[in-house]
Amino acid sequence: MVKTQRVVITPGEPAGIGPDLVVQLAQREWPVELVVCADATLLTNRAAMLGLPLTLRPYSPNSPAQPQTAGTLTLLPVALRESVTAGQLAVENGHYVVETLARACDGCLNGEFAALITGPVHKGVINDAGIPFTGHTEFFEERSQAKKVVMMLATEELRVALATTHLPLRDIADAITPALLHEVIAILHHDLRTKFGIAEPRILVCGLNPHAGEGGHMGTEEIDTIIPVLDELRAQGMKLNGPLPADTLFQPKYLDNADAVLAMYHDQGLPVLKYQGFGRGVNITLGLPFIRTSVDHGTALELAGRGKADVGSFITALNLAIKMIVNTQ
């Protein structure tokens, strides 16, 4: 890394395990400065519950970034709306969660931070607070005014991107248009090159229907939409294999010769990845004007403050973000 960079972290739902995981992250040295966008009392109280040392130092944007020393975090303060009891949701803190996301996103957009790592949020409590919220991906897409973003989940062995994300199954076929596929594949290809450092990405593309349509006998979306788009993009030099049946694509004979998989919808690609590497996966938002990674699990309210939360996914998300920072420098 040419110089020390700052990475901003949002712990997510304050009553969940996000604060626990951030405190655990702080127990080791990091080659970047970790700036946590959160309430100070929340973090110090959670550290005390876990019996872990934590020193918070104030965020100083005009000072050079310093590598993180064990037992410390840099604090960018955002105040809670209500006091927190570990494991118990408070509706007003839905506003607090969104405020942390907005501040962290804005800091990435204005160049304060090289990457953003997000902890798990509780979508229900945010919506109950009167804030329409579908998820991190959509929130950052809108706030950054990105033209289009793509959701990817990754483990050490497998990367899966999604053509569509949080749509009901009944709406997916209509959503798979030539324009969408052109846009999604272009973003996936671009970010595999620039953020992952893969010179010539090899992408496996799932069909939409069982058996990838069986030559039109089980749906025509492959013939009408997917194949023509892939042919056009192959002619431009992209290495695309597909459309392939999703029930056979996830085999070593295909995956060993690919850098990423493009699934047509959420539950087509992610169950395989989560079965293979649950707790080790990372959620990545492609197409943003900054690096964003996240844990692949939920708030686990029942584990908050008990010292039983597994920090593995957060560590993987941070390590991947650091690698992506290096690749983009």
UniProtKB/Swiss-Prot annotation:
The record describes how the cofactor is bound as: Binds 1 divalent metal cation per subunit. Can use ions such as Zn(2+), Mg(2+) or Co(2+).
Among its keywords, does the record have Oxidoreductase? yes
Q: Which SUPFAM superfamilies match?
A: Isocitrate/Isopropylmalate dehydrogenase-like
Q: Which GO terms describe its molecular function?
A: 4-hydroxythreonine-4-phosphate dehydrogenase activity; cobalt ion binding; magnesium ion binding; NAD binding; zinc ion binding
EC number(s) per UniProt?
1.1.1.262
Cofactor entry: Zn(2+); Mg(2+); Co(2+)
Q: Where in the cell is it found?
A: Cytoplasm
Q: Name one GO biological process term.
A: pyridoxine biosynthetic process
Which residues does the record give as a divalent metal cation binding sites? H166, H211, H266
Q: Which EC class, in a word?
A: oxidoreductase
| Pathway, per record | Cofactor biosynthesis; pyridoxine 5'-phosphate biosynthesis; pyridoxine 5'-phosphate from D-erythrose 4-phosphate: step 4/5
Keywords attached to this Swiss-Prot or TrEMBL record, sorted alphabetically, are: Cobalt, Cytoplasm, Magnesium, Metal-binding, NAD, NADP, Oxidoreductase, Pyridoxine biosynthesis, Zinc
Amino-acid positions noted as binding substrate in the UniProt annotation, renumbered to this chain: H136, T137, K274, N283, R292
| A GO term from the CC aspect | cytoplasm
- Entry annotated with the keyword Transmembrane: no
**Could you tell me which InterPro entries the record lists for this protein?**
PdxA, PdxA_fam
What extra comment accompanies this record? The active site is located at the dimer interface.
Query: What does this protein's UniProt record list under function?
Result: Catalyzes the NAD(P)-dependent oxidation of 4-(phosphooxy)-L-threonine (HTP) into 2-amino-3-oxo-4-(phosphooxy)butyric acid which spontaneously decarboxylates to form 3-amino-2-oxopropyl phosphate (AHAP).
**PANTHER family per UniProt:** 4-HYDROXYTHREONINE-4-PHOSPHATE DEHYDROGENASE
Similarity annotation: Belongs to the PdxA family.
The annotated subunit structure for this chain is:
Homodimer.
Please give the name of this protein: 4-hydroxythreonine-4-phosphate dehydrogenase
Q: Which organism is it from?
A: Escherichia coli O17:K52:H18 (strain UMN026 / ExPEC)
Q: Which gene encodes it?
A: pdxA
